[in-house]
Amino acid sequence: MKKYILMPVLAALSLSGSVIQAQDFDNNPVVNVSNSKENLNFTIGARFMMDGAYYHSDFTPVKSGAAITDARIRTSMSYEDWYFYADFDFSKGKFSQKNIFLQYSLEGAKGTHRFKAGYYNNPVSMANNTSRGSLHFISRSAAANAFSPSRELGLSYIFYNDHFFANQGVFAENKYNDQPSGYQGMSLGGRWVWRPINNDDRTFHLGAAFRYANIATGTVENNVLKTELDMGSSLETYVDATQDFLSAKLPWAKNVYDVGAEFLYKTDDFFARGEYMYKHVTKKRDDQALFEANLGSIDSWGSLESWQKGNPLGDNSFHWAYIEAGYKIFGDPYQYSNSDALLKGLNGRALEVVARYSYTGLNDLVEGEKYVPGRDQYYPNGVLADYPATSLSIGGGNMHSATLGVNYSFNKFAQVMLSYTYNRLDRDKFQYDKNFHVLQARLMFQF
């Protein structure tokens, strides 16, 4: 473990130059070592988050307590128009990589062009592309957590100027190609932003996003590859990050389409932003092979058509959205990044109050179907039957969440956050759990 920490430090010491401090400490680690003769710059930084949380629920307990929720070492190196960045996480007592990418920038007559390759966030979703260190909330919304793609191995092209931003790329389904069965699927994702107002005093942007993913990895059952899409979120908290209350599994998922819209408005002392996303999932399976595999068993059917009627397969659609706002009582003005089309975090001594509402829709229920808690499944036409009993309903849960928070930054390196979140859950599986109260605090420092 020690060698992973010492290697970037030794690399930094090997470079000659002076140590300076960067202004955007979240995106650029602050310890800089420069070699002007070679036009080379190396940075190293770290980030640590410690959370404490108290939970109150109607029936099923949630584990209150404290936890290390983020602990990272971050490094970067720039040479002329080339930039390399990597950060590594140790928060769960083990080493894991986060962002690792190489980027080439080219200044053009109409703006900046960037070419990016490595392991990083799919561009879809403004919230998911905002670093946790720049968030004005302890957690992203449950909506963004449940539906947004995470980091993926890919290639991207980015263009931006004062009024436009475009980020699109192609990505692999599995960064290690270590899936149990199947081959690498792929996805295409993009986010496009127009900034009709963008100056030192205020910024207003409107954006759109699209993603297509082809799922090609899974497990083999009866000599047939079974793909699956898993979605879920915690109760907008990290201390007990269980997704038991809000989650869904979509067997035989094949094609995933995400279409979204966003807005952002900020002045020196106020910001508001929000997103809406629609997700549609189509499914595919080898019915003939599964029908033949069941012949002669208790699950056998007389014909393929009767098997298909007893085992229907349908598409699913979901929706999610959030809106959040903040007011700065004192401190440096809110800042906006043209290169990322994102709101930056607090910088220097500051105090702010924030609020958010989010909706996460993981229910896609067929009218008339009945849920039986003892069997944890839905039954077609409201009829409880042992055979057949295949349902098209997805009961992952719908949740409304409202958050109020106060954030105080001592300086550009240390910050405390306090928030209260009320979650209202509607899920048949947890019929006695409707109300979840979350009171949590965070101590964060980074350099």
Report residues per predicted region.
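Hydrophobic alpha-helical membrane context
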Residues: 14-15, 82, 287
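Extended ligand-binding clefts on enzyme/binding-domain cores
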Residues: 202-243, 248-252
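Outer-membrane beta-barrel and related beta-rich outer-membrane complex signature
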Residues: 127-131, 180, 216-225, 284-288, ...
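Positively charged n-region of N-terminal signal peptides that target proteins for export
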Residues: 1-4
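Outer-membrane beta-barrel pore domains
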Residues: 59-60, 230-447
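Outer membrane beta-barrel
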Residues: 29-56, 60-216, 317, 322, ...
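N-terminal periplasmic/intermembrane-space "pro-region" immediately following the signal or transit peptide
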Residues: 6-15, 19-47, 335-336, 374, ...
